[in-house]
Every structure is written in C-alpha cells, then in structure tokens.
C-alpha cells in the first residue's frame, strides 16, 4: 500500500475556499498612531537603500496567482499568562470544522502566542495593536521589554511579539530604535501550522473529535474537541493546570468580532468562521525541563485554562496537550456533544483532505522516536523525526477513514501504554512491541486514565518505538478501523508491566525478566478481555448520545508490531488451509529469545459487512477453555494442536489438497458406503450376503502410499456374485447416464433426489445445501435409516427382471396423465421399457405391441392422428349400419344355436375337440347369414337412394 500522503486528492471539497487580502486582517481602527507612520517611513527608506522591491503591507494583496513567501502576521496584542513549550512534527495536520452559519461581515480573530521568554531590545514593528521586534542575536537580553515573547525560526531569526492582558483592548507601546525597519516574518518550510476552529480545544486524551450537531444555533467557546498526534519533548508529560479560572470574558461592544485565518500550502490565506480558541503551530522548541526520580528528563507543558490557545513547535516525540475545561464563563459553555457539525481538514504533503463525518474521528499516530525517559539504562539520545503523513480511505456509509503515519523508522523498540480517558470508567489499551536487539531491556509504563477530572486524565507517558501501524478505537457512534493490517504481534517481554502510580524509574527498573513475574504474565489475557468488555459498554453508551452519523459498530483493537529491518521480518509464518469463515487462525513461531519456544495463536478477523477492514489479535502464554474460543475474536492457547477447518463446498478442490494416503482412505470409505447401500437393495431371497470389512489397510508411518490421483467419485462395478449382478444389471447403465439433481430444499436427503435414491453421492450437481456427500456422512446415514424404516424396499431398483424371460418391468409403474407416457419424465419410457399392467397411466401410448409408437415422441404423432380423423369420419356411417344388423335379438339367436349344438354333441358323447369345431362352424354359419342379409338390405337401400336422385 502506498502510504505517502503527497498524492492524495481532496475529498468532499466541493465549496471553493475564500481568498482574503491583507487588509481584511487589520483591525478597524479610525486613527493611525505616529508610531505607525514612523515605522512605515523607516520601512520605505530601508527598502529604497537596500535595493529591495518590497510592497507596502497595506497594499500587499494575497489574491495574485503567483506564489508568495510565507509571511507570519501577528494581528492582535492580547496577553495570555501561560508558559511552556510544546512541539509538533512536520507535515502539519490542519483541522477545520465547518457547518455553522457564515458571518455576515468579515471578522477579525486574535492569534495568541503563549510562549513567554525574555526578549531583547531590537527594532520593532507594530501592525494594528501588536508590536513585533526582530533581532538576529539573542545574546543581549534586557528586562526593559519583559512583556514581549521571543520566537526563533529555523533560519536564525528571532521574533519578539508583544501581548496584552486578555479581554482588554489596551496595547502596550514598545519603543524601538529609529533605525529599525519593518522585517517580514518569513515562515520556513519546516514550520507547519495547525488551526482548530469552531469551538475546538486541545486535550490530552489523544483523540481528535469532530463536532457533533448542536441543538443551539450558535457555538460557544469552550466546546471540547481533542487532538492526538502530539507528544512532549523527551517523552515528558503534558500537564493541565488545575486552577479554575474563567474561560473567556464576554466581548465588549467596542471589541470587534473575530475570525480564524488559515494559510494553505500554496500561500493563500483562508478566513474561517471561528467562535472558539485557535491554535498556532509556530514556536520554538522548549528548553526548560524537569528532572523526575530516576534521572528521567521530561518537559512540563502547562496550559492556561482561560482561553485554550497554544503555540506548538517541532517535536522529537508525541505531545499531548489539553486545556482545562472552563469553570466560569461569561458567555456560557456547552458540552462537546452539542458542538456544531463540520468537516475535518487534514493536510499532508501540500494537499488537503476533507473528511465528511459528523461523529468522532480519531487519529492516533505513533511516535517515530524514543526519548531518554524510557531508556534509563541505555542512555540513548532522542532521535529526531521526519514528521507525519496522513492517508485517507473511503468507507461504508459515507465515512472517510483517516490514518496518520510517521515517515522515518527508529531502531530502538520500546513498550508503552497509551491512556485513554473515559467519561464512565477507566480504560487501558496496551500497545505491545518487541524489544530491540540492542541489549537494552524494554520498559512498559502503564498509565491509568481517571474520569474524575481532565487534569487527572491528562498525564500520559507516550514515548514509543516506531511502527507503521496505528491503534484506533471507537467512541461516540463511529469507528476508524485500520485499512488491511496483516501484521503479527511478537510476544511481549516477561514481566514488562507496572502500575500507573509508580514513577518512570520504578517502571524501568522492573523490566528485567525473572521467574517471579510469571503471575502478571498469566493475567494479561484476562485484562485484555476486561478491556474489550468495558470499551464495548462505553462505546454503546456514547453512540446513544450521538445525533447523526453512520451506525455505530463494535470496537476493534489492533495490536501490531514494528516493521524495522528485514531481519526482524524473517520469522516463519504458516497459514492454514483457506477458509470461508470470518475468522482465520495463523500460527507463528517466534525466534526471539523471550518466546521460550511457545507457540502463539493469532486471530485474523475480517467482518463481512464492513469495508474490508481486517483485524488481528494475539493471545500468548495463557491457555483457555474451548468455550471462549470465538468470543470477540479470541482463541485459546493450544499447544501443538490446530483445529480442523470447516469443509469447503467444492469437494474436488478439497480432494486435490489431500495427501496420497488421505485420498486412498477417502476412496475406500466412499466405496464402503456405496457397497453398504447396494447390500440393502438386494432381494431378501439372497442367502449369502456380501460382508464388508470395516478394517482399512494401514501403512507404516514412514512409508507413503503411491496412489495415483483419481477423480473424487467413481462408478461402482457390479458385485462378483450372480444374484448381485442380476440385481444391478437391470439398471442398464442408468447410473452413468442419469441427469444431475437440482434439489434446493431437501438437502439431497429425500427419495425424489435421484442421486440419493440410487445410493450415490452428488457429483457435479446444481443442488443447494447438499448433504449427500462424505462430509455429512452422519446425517446421510440417518436419512437412509429413516427411509428404510418407512419402506424397506425404498432403495431397491425400480426396474427389475422377472424370474423368466428377458423383459424388464417397472416395480411400481408410472402414473402419467397427459404425456401419453412418451416423455422422459415417464420412468418406463426413460428406461426403454413398455408400460405394464402395474402402471396407472392414462392414455398410454408406450405399449409393447406398437413398436413404432414405443420410442417416438407424442409430437411426431400429431400428423398421423389428423389423417386418422379424416378416415374415421368416412367410416362412421358404416359403423352405424352395422349396429342396425347386430341387434340383441340377432346375437341371442346366434348364441342359442351354438348352445343347442353343444347339447346335442354331449348326448352323443362326441369328443371335446370335435364339439369345439362344431360350435365354431355353427357361429360361422350364423355370421354368414347375417352378412348376406345385410348385403341384401344395403343393395336395396342404394337402389332406393339412387331412384330419388335420378
């Protein structure tokens, strides 16, 4: 998969972004101070002397098509009493929430710089009510400009920004050198910006929440939205201030409205409707560190709870920043669930991605560098990271899945625990990574997330090794799964577990494996199960409170391992036979020394209703019963055993996968089953039944049977005995020429299935849910037994030969009504035999005395029947005249003459043969007289008819 974020196209970006000029960001002031005029005059003189062609800031429009330098403009001078430096990686992540009503007129926002350092005197620049002082050397720091903030850029420039007290419009004038001019603040390419708008605050929970649709029409500052992807310097912790102060004072009538300004990658400035605090990522790396017990260095980041505006710089790891929830507000605050809906903009590699999701979208990038906090014995220096990049995949139901990855890789592997605070109860997600082959024992720090207060939940130690996979979970009615993760988790180090109350040094000192740490290792699987149950309950409660968005899904946890060098990826992985089920088991044998030669079983879960997302979870070290094998994607620990996979519907494919010895056994079992059915079909008069030997020939373990590959099914040969041959021979090859069954509801276990009735297995049939095969031998035997109980001759051949003669007859006879027994569904006609007296057919034409009609179809006889109808009409008159002469009196007189002749011969004791001859002669004489009389009558009638006609 291409994880580069540079070639991503924008999604759901249908509205064009507005372009603003520089005049839109200036405060609407009616007067211009003398200091402004003086600085502008100095700037014009300096430009003319130096030969630089710089446009006036008032006329410097950004709407021109050519690309201009990245200029940082400080718009408003409002002081925020907070200190501490935070860091952010390159490849900035821009978050923009939209969906609210656009402002009626252009509004000016205040971008506040929170980092406070000691400034130095230099030439100053005042734009609006903000004074900026620039100096190239930070050596001479004086206390005269104590109200300025120093910012150092990559190119060596030092920028001083003046800030005033929050909530006031007063500005502190800074006296600058007359020779100083206006210096353009050019942002280097490495400095990125992250702007949160529409009621967005920073939190230490490690999650990014998009605003949920609010019931109110206006958004109030203080709505909580959290961001993950930031880590403190040197693996430190981000602490929120515990003091409770008012959030933001209500603006006075003279105070102008505020807007949010975002600079895009192509140099354009975008004005965004902003009612909440903003975040500017363009600051210096923090220098102040605090020493924790055990020699671990950490950077303490303190944020003011009053506004929630933060300045971030480039980090070595992840920084978790959170502003405390305001306690007292003049304008009021709402919960995060009532924020206005919008979109989240993720920028990576110069392109923008718009994610349309009204619910929660959570990004969880892994830190690409380690810090000295976790490695207390190795003494390694923290390595720098190249930054983050984001990729986005389309999901089901309009959800866009965003995945943030880091660019570089780190060789040192650590084991850490990410704390995720909940509103109901404490949650822990354990991320497992193998220790690096550097001799440094891996450490594991478990941090609990308390739900009582945000300050208690904002402490997390997140210095982790490099992985190209991330852990995502669901909360609030939407989940962001991993796209196609197929990695295996190596076994965690023995005893690498500690409590949240222990310091980092205590957690590092407890990383040495020993025999006394077997008990914590046995309880890890139980802890994982408890975490899954808790997360499921929390996610279900959170999904109930959401107003819009896609249907909530159950959370999935993905635990992956780092992908370092090629040597680490050389562990043998063996997959079982392909299965159609949703869960696949993969057995991996680890070569690491900490595995203790025990096998680990992985579950490969692929939900069918999702968008193809795949999950894999490892269980190792703890045996489980079979009752919890398939519970939430877990399987028990089995030593040197694998479960038999379910059968595959194409049986020939399965037969090809069998070994030679299994194929021979399969064929022998099939032959026995067929022979058993044939034995039941033999006549009861057979005195010597065939014995079927249940024993199969066995071979030594080392010898393999060289059996050539045969088809899955074969036609049985007739038995050796004459009686059995007589019973099977009447089929006349019907088995080979029969048509395939097409059963859909009977599972091929009823007698109207030709395959089942003939005692054969279904082969190349179009039946559904077929049980007439060796895979369901138990069900098939049960159906055969029930049929024989009802009808002992159920499986006997329908067409048998009589004791004498060669004619074959049907045992039951056909029951045709309309076809005249000339269609193939007539069993007698299909077997090439005439219908007998047993048949109950109506209008039968399949008779022995008519060979011309026997094998012809009824359609070919339609023309013959038409000709016969014409002849029948001509003969109808003659038949009516015959009835005139053969009356009841004539027939009775003829019979009386024959009887009188018999009585006379009996009195004379004449032989029987002579008596029969005399009787027949008497009947012949009677018929001769009748015919002669009829001829006379016919001639008379013809003469009578000819006379009137003439």
UniProtKB/Swiss-Prot annotation:
Encoding gene per record = mip120
Assembly and partners? Component of the DREAM complex at least composed of Myb, Caf1-55, mip40, mip120, mip130, E2f2, Dp, Rbf, Rbf2, lin-52, HDAC1/Rpd3 and l(3)mbt.
State what protein this is by name: Protein lin-54 homolog
Family of the protein in this entry: Belongs to the lin-54 family.
* Entry's localization field: Nucleus
One Gene Ontology biological process: oogenesis
Q: Name one GO molecular function term.
A: DNA binding
Q: Which organism is it from?
A: Drosophila melanogaster (Fruit fly)
Here the segments flagged for biased composition (Acidic residues) are 10-26, 40-55
Q: Where is the composition biased (Low complexity)?
A: 366-386, 500-516, 535-548, 661-682
């Amino acid at each position: 998969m291409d994880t580069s974020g540079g070639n991503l196209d924008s999604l759901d970006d249908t509205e064009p972004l507005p372009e603003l000029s520089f005049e839109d960001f200036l405060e609407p002031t009616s007067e211009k101070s003398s200091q402004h005029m003086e600085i502008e005059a100095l700037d014009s003189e300096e430009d003319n002397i130096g030969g630089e062609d710089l446009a006036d800031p008032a006329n410097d429009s950004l709407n021109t098509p050519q690309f201009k330098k990245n200029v940082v403009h400080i718009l408003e001078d409002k002081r925020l009493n907070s200190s501490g430096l935070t860091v952010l990686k390159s490849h900035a992540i821009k978050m923009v929430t939209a969906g609210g009503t656009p402002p009626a007129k252009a509004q000016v926002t205040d971008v506040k710089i929170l980092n406070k350092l000691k400034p130095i005197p230099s030439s100053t620049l005042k734009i609006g009510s903000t004074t900026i002082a620039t100096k190239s050397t930070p050596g001479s720091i004086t206390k005269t400009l104590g109200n300025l903030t120093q910012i150092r850029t990559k190119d060596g420039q030092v920028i001083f920004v003046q800030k005033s007290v929050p909530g006031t419009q007063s500005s502190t004038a800074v006296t600058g050198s007359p020779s100083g001019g206006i210096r353009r603040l050019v942002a280097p390419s490495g400095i990125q910006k992250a702007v949160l708008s529409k009621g967005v605050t920073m939190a230490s929970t490690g999650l990014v929440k998009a605003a949920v649709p609010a019931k109110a029409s206006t958004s109030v500052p203080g709505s909580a939205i959290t961001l993950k992807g930031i880590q403190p310097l040197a693996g430190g912790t981000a602490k929120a201030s515990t003091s409770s102060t008012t959030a933001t004072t209500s603006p006075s009538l003279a105070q102008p409205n505020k807007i949010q300004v975002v600079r895009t990658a192509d140099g354009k400035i975008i004005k965004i409707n902003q009612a909440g605090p903003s975040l500017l990522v363009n600051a210096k790396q923090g220098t102040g560190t605090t020493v924790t017990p055990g020699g671990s260095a950490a950077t303490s980041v303190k944020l003011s709870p009053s506004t929630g505006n933060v300045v971030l710089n480039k980090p070595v790891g992840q920084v978790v920043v959170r502003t405390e929830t305001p306690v007292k507000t003049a304008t009021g605050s709402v919960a995060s669930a009532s924020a206005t809906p919008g979109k989240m903009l993720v920028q990576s590699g110069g392109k923008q991605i718009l994610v349309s999701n009204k619910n929660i979208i959570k990004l969880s990038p892994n830190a690409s560098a380690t810090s000295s906090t976790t490695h207390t014995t190795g003494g390694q220096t923290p390595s720098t990271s190249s930054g983050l990049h984001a990729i986005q995949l389309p999901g089901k139901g309009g959800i866009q899945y965003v995945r943030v990855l880091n660019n570089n890789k780190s060789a040192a592997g650590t084991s850490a625990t990410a704390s995720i605070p909940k509103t109901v109860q404490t949650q822990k997600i354990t991320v497992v990574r193998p220790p690096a082959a550097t001799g440094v024992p891996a450490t594991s720090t478990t941090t609990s997330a308390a739900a009582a207060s945000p300050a208690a939940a904002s402490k997390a130690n997140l210095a982790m090794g490099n992985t190209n996979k991330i852990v995502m979970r669901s909360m609030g009615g939407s989940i962001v799964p991993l796209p196609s993760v197929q990695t295996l988790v190596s076994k965690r180090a023995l005893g690498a577990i500690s409590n949240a109350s222990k310091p980092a040094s205590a957690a590092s000192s407890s990383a040495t494996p020993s025999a006394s740490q077997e008990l914590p290792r046995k309880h890890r699987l139980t802890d994982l199960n408890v975490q899954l149950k808790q997360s499921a309950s929390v996610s279900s409660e959170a999904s109930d409170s959401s107003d819009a968005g896609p249907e909530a899904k159950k959370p999935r946890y993905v635990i992956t391992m780092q992908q370092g060098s090629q040597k680490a990826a050389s562990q043998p992985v063996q997959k079982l036979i392909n299965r159609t089920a949703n869960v696949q088991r993969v057995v991996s044998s680890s070569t690491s020394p900490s595995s203790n030669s025990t096998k680990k079983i992985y579950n490969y879960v692929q939900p069918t209703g999702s968008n193809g997302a795949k999950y894999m979870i490892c269980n190792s070290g703890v045996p489980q019963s079979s009752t919890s094998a398939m519970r939430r994607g877990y399987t028990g620990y089995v030593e040197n055993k694998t479960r038999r996979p379910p059968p595959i519907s194409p049986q020939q494919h399965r037969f090809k996968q069998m070994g030679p010895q299994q194929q021979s056994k399969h064929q022998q079992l099939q032959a026995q089953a067929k022979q058993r059915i044939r034995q039941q079909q033999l006549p009861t008069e057979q005195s010597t039944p065939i014995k079927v030997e249940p024993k199969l020939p066995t071979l030594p373990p080392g010898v393999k049977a060289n059996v050539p590959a045969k088809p899955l099914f074969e036609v049985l040969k007739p038995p050796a005995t004459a009686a059995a041959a007589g019973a099977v021979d009447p089929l006349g090859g019907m088995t080979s020429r029969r048509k395939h069954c097409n059963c859909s509801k009977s599972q091929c276990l009823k007698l109207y299935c030709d395959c089942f009735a003939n005692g054969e297995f279904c082969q190349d049939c179009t039946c559904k849910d077929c049980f007439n095969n060796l895979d369901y031998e138990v069900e098939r035997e049960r159906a055969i037994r029930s049929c024989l109980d009802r009808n002992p001759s159920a499986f006997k051949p329908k067409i048998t030969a009589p004791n004498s003669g060669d004619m074959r007859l049907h045992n039951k006879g056909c029951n045709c009504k309309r076809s005249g027994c000339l269609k193939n569904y007539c069993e007698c006609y299909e077997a090439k035999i005439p219908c007998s007296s047993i048949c109950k057919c109506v209008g039968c034409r399949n008779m022995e005395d008519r060979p011309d009609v026997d094998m012809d179809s009824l359609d070919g006889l339609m023309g013959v029947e038409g000709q016969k109808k014409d002849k029948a009409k001509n003969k109808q008159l003659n038949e009516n005249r015959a009835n005139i002469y053969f009356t009841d009196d004539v027939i009775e007189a003829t019979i009386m003459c024959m009887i009188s002749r018999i009585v006379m011969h009996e009195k004379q004791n004449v032989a029987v043969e002579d008596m029969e001859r005399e009787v027949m002669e008497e009947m012949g004489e009677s018929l001769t007289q009748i015919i002669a009389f009829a001829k006379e009558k016919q001639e008379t009638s013809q003469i009578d008819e000819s006379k009137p006609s003439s």
